[in-house]
From Swiss-Prot:
GO cellular component, one term: neuronal ribonucleoprotein granule
Protein name: Kinesin-like protein KIF3C
Key words of the record: ATP-binding, Coiled coil, Cytoplasm, Cytoskeleton, Microtubule, Motor protein, Nucleotide-binding
Gene Ontology terms: biological process: microtubule-based movement
Chief subcellular location: cytoplasm
Database matches in PROSITE patterns: KINESIN_MOTOR_1, KINESIN_MOTOR_2
Places the protein is found: Cytoplasm, Cytoskeleton
Organism lineage: Eukaryota, Metazoa, Chordata, Craniata, Vertebrata
InterPro entries assigned to the protein according to its UniProt record, in alphabetical order: Kinesin-like_fam, Kinesin_motor_CS, Kinesin_motor_dom, Kinesin_motor_dom_sf, P-loop_NTPase
Amino acid sequence: MASKTKASEALKVVARCRPLSRKEEAAGHEQILTMDVKLGQVTLRNPRAAPGELPKTFTFDAVYDASSKQADLYDETVRPLIDSVLQGFNGTVFAYGQTGTGKTYTMQGTWVEPELRGVIPNAFEHIFTHISRSQNQQYLVRASYLEIYQEEIRDLLSKEPGKRLELKENPETGVYIKDLSSFVTKNVKEIEHVMNLGNQARAVGSTHMNEVSSRSHAIFVITVECSERGSDGQDHIRVGKLNLVDLAGSERQNKAGPNAAGGPATQPTAGGGSGSGSASGSASSGERPKEASKINLSLSALGNVIAALAGNRSTHIPYRDSKLTRLLQDSLGGNAKTIMVATLGPASHSYDESLSTLRFANRAKNIKNKPRVNEDPKDTLLREFQEEIARLKAQLEKKGMLGKRPRRKSSRRKKAVSAPAGYPEGSVIEAWVAEEEDDNNNNHHPPQPILEAALEKNMENYLQDQKERLEEEKAAIQDDRSLVSEEKQKLLEEKEKMLEDLRREQQATELLAAKYKAMESKLLIGGRNIMDHTNEQQKMLELKRQEIAEQKRREREMQQEMLLRDEETMELRGTYSSLQQEVEVKTKKLKKLYAKLQAVKAEIQDQHEEYIRVRQDLEEAQNEQTRELKLKYLIIENFIPPEEKNKIMNRLFLDCEEEQWRFQPLVPAGVNNSQMKKRPTSAVGYKRPISQYARVAMAMGSHPRYRAENIMFLELDVSPPAIFEMEFSHDQEQDPRVLHMERLMRLDSFLERPSTTKVRKSRSWCQSPQRMPPPSTAHASMTSVPLHPATVVDHD
């Protein structure tokens, strides 16, 4: 077993180059990358270089050319990391590179072909094979799958994959995702099913450079908990966490813009390949520039973190600049062992992107992590499972569903065992039991399923016997004529109650046993049902494979060291046989130093050009965001009233954990919303809301029209009104002024009638009789209103 802690460990970086595609070969692009597998060097040639410019060389822990196999990468680079995770370390594997360089192929590969399987399916097989070969250890394996799409965290295993999750931080456990679903898996088939479900919901799309391009960063998390009894007799739990990261590729819109076809995005099929479908959040080609902007921003934040960690001069590490860097905080400079796979494109048109990837990977080599074993953490799910299983087992033993295991001889035989408590006296159970010679040796256990099946069968027989016995007692009670009918009925009811209690207890016991079996099946215990000979052979093959990989690594390191020493030896050699030899040696050394000087100058120039490109990309993203902000300000100023805007601004607050502005709830948390709302002030004491003017008018005792009436209680006056017929047929021949004066005179005569004239008036029950205005007032008010020649109705 490896040591529990190390002072520091460098981040392991490997480079992998894909072959030229048919499209690139048809376009006439040449190969500009050269991979030296033995020395671990990558040589990049500039297709636009001036005559005499030397190619750039980068050295990594390992390199894999276009002819490399998936198994070579996994066995030599990833397998030691998975072994460390099984021992309780945190581990991370992530692929970085330009879009279309084979990141998803490296991480996932082709699931249906064993030779083309990537890192993730090989890791599944490795983990469960190790568990099956282990001895005296209990394992619990759970898996989670998430993606970061446009800086939003989504759970790919949730029923609502588009729902946004929150990123939280705990001082003890570090960064975690709230409400992230996790599934306990028992074998390779189950964890592959979980992976395929997540792939169906992942956002992918088609671009010019890749038909199935990942539009989000995906992280598959495997947590392995192991319980093992220590020398002190106590169970110790180790927790290893493996992050398998498939990053979206960095891209430029002039090269990797959306396909001409546009249309919906595609999704991986259940087999891990690619198919067609509707990807979440990627419904049209118009989303591609926005997706690319978010991808490049998060990768730029990742580059800033790596640059700050590699420089050893920065006191602040900008982990909070992106969701991706916060989730990978432990993997970059923290408690984890990390492997970075830099994927490269060999074509000449990808020179700038390949150079950027190589520089990024070269900086990452200088990051130092501090991995340690996560032993006996507080929040382990395995410990909760063990405690719950022990509690259920105790209840089942108390109810008599589980038999105790006798320990005498080391032979297994079929024998009769006494029935547990609750069975009739003298009943026995035939079951397979294991007898051991040594009471302290518990390696050989009885076949538990056979024993439990026998116990359940006898429990059913016992229940049937009890039913028959109760039926016989009921029949005996009914035939007994010495008992009074009331006593018979009472005894029969007691027997029925006993039978019903027995049935309920049986159902509860069966539910308890089912829960116990379900929880126990989730715990994986190695060393069962495996042939020892085959097991030993597989272990020996793995050890040999690891020794070969370790030997290759040492050979590569020794060759790199020999090259450095040759240069030092050449510089230290100072004795020459003649002046001519000294001139030749120093001329050669001068040319070599001059070439190095030119390479450094070219590197500085490339760095300056790269800086200009990055700045232009950032300025373009900033201008795009500024345009969106101006558009939103324009909408707010023209369509939202100032008072509504102030209400919104007053509700805003900054969420420090998410670093985003949020709205405060309209109703404060903790307030009981079930209480009835108060009646508005304008309607207190009235049947309906009344304006302030109407209330003042009512208080002053003026016109009763301001009174609050209920029309349902209004008494109607059904008496017909007085009707007077007036002749206006000759008015058309007269002068209009004369006609108007005649009308006024008729109105005066009508108003000045004596009170004895019978005229019926109708008024509301709430109206009081009002004094009619004098004739002069009536004249003044009616002079400007011409009367239509029609029937006049007097309503007062």
